[in-house]
């Protein structure tokens, strides 16, 4: 796997990281404000945490944070009930990113909710992977755009000279609402994740709901992918950390 990555995926990943640093440089003031906001919430690693956690921090170019609450969502029903509830409460923006989005029962409920919030004045920024969602019809995307949502595919390459790379995919599943609540995990947007598909039957996967400073870190992950796909940096909350819901 490592040699294959080195041959097939190395240059694209390097380009992705360069694009992320470019986004930071282009919006340096906002990035400095974000880092200043996050500094009091950085976790202090001790013992073996320094050895292993430090490696993860260097690889991700992000710090571990303290003062978060993590709510485990153990199936698709719990996951999308919580996601829909959070989106309903959105006042400023919703960030959405999934590997697979389907034009089925769940997919259309999701689309209709985002369209309604967009018409209410909430900004919607939506990324989907062009291979994972290759069956998504154009009318689905067009409907969201007509409602005012910004929806874009995550391409495997950038620039006309780059060859297509099916291996460089984006499997992230992220939702962030107003920079105050976030979701990340294993569920995509499709009926099978609710366990109602006749083809797949019962489905077991896990998501988590986050509050606290980790939400802004998750938002930064989305921003890197969004800039890669669009060369745009949307105006987001980088300076206010919403306290965790619990202790």
Residue ranges of each PLM-predicted region?
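N-terminal localization/anchoring segments of enzymes in phospholipid and broader phosphate metabolism
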Residues: 1-247
